[in-house]
A protein has these predicted regions:
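Structural boundary micro-motifs
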Residues: 1-74
C-alpha cells in the first residue's frame, strides 16, 4: 500500500506554488502535467505519487484540502 494520498492545496499569496511543489517533492511526489505559463489555482496529488497544477477552483477538485503548513508536517 502506498503512502501517497489524493490531496489538494490551494495556491495563493500565503501558499505560493514554488513552496508547495518543494514540499510535495520532499515527500516523494513527482510532476505529472504542467505547472508553468498558466494561472495555477491549486495543486492536486494522487495515490500514485504524482502531482499537477490546476486552474479550477479547489472546491471542484476531488481530494482532501490541506494547507501548506499541514503539508510541511507530513
Amino acid at each position: 500500500m502506498s503512502d501517497y494520498k489524493n490531496i489538494k492545496v490551494e495556491i495563493n499569496k500565503e501558499q505560493p506554488l514554488d513552496e508547495v511543489v518543494r514540499e510535495l517533492e520532499r515527500l516523494g511526489y513527482q510532476i505529472n502535467g504542467w505547472l508553468e505559463n498558466r494561472i495555477i489555482r491549486s495543486v492536486k496529488t494522487n495515490h500514485f505519487g504524482l502531482y499537477s497544477g490546476d486552474f479550477f477552483d479547489v472546491d471542484i477538485i476531488q481530494g482532501d484540502l490541506i494547507t501548506l503548513a499541514e503539508l510541511k508536517e507530513m
